[in-house]
């Protein structure tokens, strides 16, 4: 059980690190492109406020 909890904590830390790195290098998170060689990952977010 401790190993499972440690893996979840590690995953959360990695996700938070990725978000903080994106915020530091970009002015917003609505559009993020990551290119490695010939591979590109693009993430777009859209929302509507009520």
From Swiss-Prot:
Other notes: Interrupted by an IS186 element, which silences the locus in strain K12 MG1655.
Q: Which family does it belong to?
A: Belongs to the Hok/Gef family.
Q: Where in the cell is it found?
A: Cell inner membrane
- CC per GO annotation: periplasmic space; plasma membrane
Residue ranges spanning the membrane: these are 6-24
Name the membrane topology term.
Answer: Single-pass type II membrane protein
Q: Which residues lie on this side of the membrane: Cytoplasmic?
A: 1-5
Residue numbers on the Periplasmic membrane side? 25-50
Q: Which UniProt keywords apply?
A: Cell inner membrane, Cell membrane, Disulfide bond, Membrane, Signal-anchor, Toxin-antitoxin system, Transmembrane, Transmembrane helix
Q: What is known of its domains?
A: The periplasmic portion confers toxicity; dimerization is not required for toxicity.
| Coiled coil feature spans | none
**What's this chain's function?**
Toxic component of a type I toxin-antitoxin (TA) system. When overexpressed kills cells within minutes; causes collapse of the transmembrane potential and arrest of respiration. Its toxic effect is probably neutralized by antisense antitoxin RNA SokC.
Q: How does it assemble?
A: Homodimer; disulfide-linked.
Name of the molecule in the record: Toxic protein HokC
